[in-house]
């Protein structure tokens, strides 16, 4: 009772599936994109409310050519930086590395605007 002829097609398919999966996953992910992927599942309102509960009133900033704090005017940036503090979102750059990086940087800006609106209501210079 040799079962090899019955199992052989299954083994071949499994081997092909494993080698294909390995081949497609070998492409490196841009580290800037990797640092921003959390934004796809993030909830800025919930995250900001959690930060307020922990008394972490730092605003979120974007490090491009200079630090930009979404929702804060350039004139007020220094006051808010000194009084509330700023936490930079990692993965932001003044160089767009790919379409995916651009999409995530735009999402980071939108996230920071919503997050900072809540924090700003709690931290006034």
Residue ranges and their predicted role:
Residues 23-25:
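Bacterial signal peptide processing site
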Residues 27-125:
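Post-signal/leader-peptide non-cytosolic segments of secretory proteins
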Residues 18-21:
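C-terminal motif of bacterial Sec signal peptides marking the signal peptidase cleavage site
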């Amino acid at each position: 009772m040799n079962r090899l002829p019955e199992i052989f097609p299954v083994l071949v398919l499994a081997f092909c599936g494993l080698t294909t999966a390995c081949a497609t996953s070998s492409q490196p992910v841009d580290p800037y994109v990797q640092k921003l992927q959390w934004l796809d599942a993030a909830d800025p309102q919930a995250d900001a409310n959690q930060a307020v509960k922990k008394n972490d009133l730092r605003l979120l900033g974007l490090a491009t050519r200079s630090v930009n704090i979404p929702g804060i005017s350039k004139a007020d940036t220094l006051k808010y930086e000194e009084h509330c503090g700023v936490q930079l979102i990692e993965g932001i750059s003044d160089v767009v590395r790919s379409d995916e990086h651009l999409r995530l940087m735009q999402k980071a800006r939108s996230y920071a605007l919503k997050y900072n609106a809540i924090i700003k209501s709690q931290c006034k210079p």
